[in-house]
């Protein structure tokens, strides 16, 4: 009886560990179709949103993540905060920018900062690097996108 209980606990622990690993390292692409009113020129328009990476690394040079992004063929990419981790010893602006330099080759990139950017102490450096890479930073701003004679407006509200 004790051996079965011990074996059950070990198996349960292994399953829990595998689940937690997958939760933190799995890449999931969720597709959503907006059913509200949009201009006809934007029919079929794909917006890929990335949030809360917090300097997480998915494979060598983010290759698994970049493959998923490339396969989705987005018209634009929107990063809605927390690209970097706010903790002093884990904020990696260079690593984040390596990812950004790859992203801008797929589609125009728009960025709104999150609390991690502002609390990292590296926001000014990151913002300058993003702009230099061709990213549109929308902190408390907007950008009008035109397609097939129609327009939509992206709004960004910074999280401080």
Where are these regions (language model features)?
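Short acidic/polar mixed-charge low-complexity motifs
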Residues: 45, 150-151
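N-terminal active-site segment of His-dependent metallophosphoesterases
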Residues: 13-99
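Core catalytic region of metal-dependent phosphoesterases/phosphodiesterases
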Residues: 61-146
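Active-site-proximal loop/helix segment associated with metal-binding centers of metalloenzymes
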Residues: 156-160
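Short strand-coil-strand connectors
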Residues: 41, 146-148
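Short amphipathic, positively biased membrane-proximal segments
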Residues: 1-14
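Conserved beta-strand elements of the Class I
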Residues: 48, 153-155
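Conserved hydrophobic/aromatic beta-strand scaffold that supports enzyme active sites
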Residues: 29-33, 142, 154
């Amino acid at each position: 009886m004790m051996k079965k209980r011990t074996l059950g606990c070990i198996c349960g622990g292994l399953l829990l560990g595998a689940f937690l690993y997958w939760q933190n390292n799995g890449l999931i692409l969720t597709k959503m179709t907006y059913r509200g009113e949009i201009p006809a020129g934007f029919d079929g328009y794909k917006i890929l949103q990335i949030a809360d990476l917090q300097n997480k690394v998915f494979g060598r040079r983010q290759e698994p993540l970049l493959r998923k992004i490339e396969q989705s063929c987005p018209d634009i990419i929107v990063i809605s905060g927390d690209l970097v981790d706010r903790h002093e010893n884990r904020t990696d602006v260079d690593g984040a920018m390596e990812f950004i330099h790859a992203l801008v080759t797929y589609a125009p990139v728009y960025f709104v900062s999150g609390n991690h950017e502002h609390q990292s102490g590296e926001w000014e450096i990151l913002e300058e690097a993003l702009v230099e890479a061709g990213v549109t930073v929308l902190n408390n701003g907007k950008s009008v996108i035109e397609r097939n004679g129609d327009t939509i407006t992206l709004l960004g509200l910074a999280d401080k």
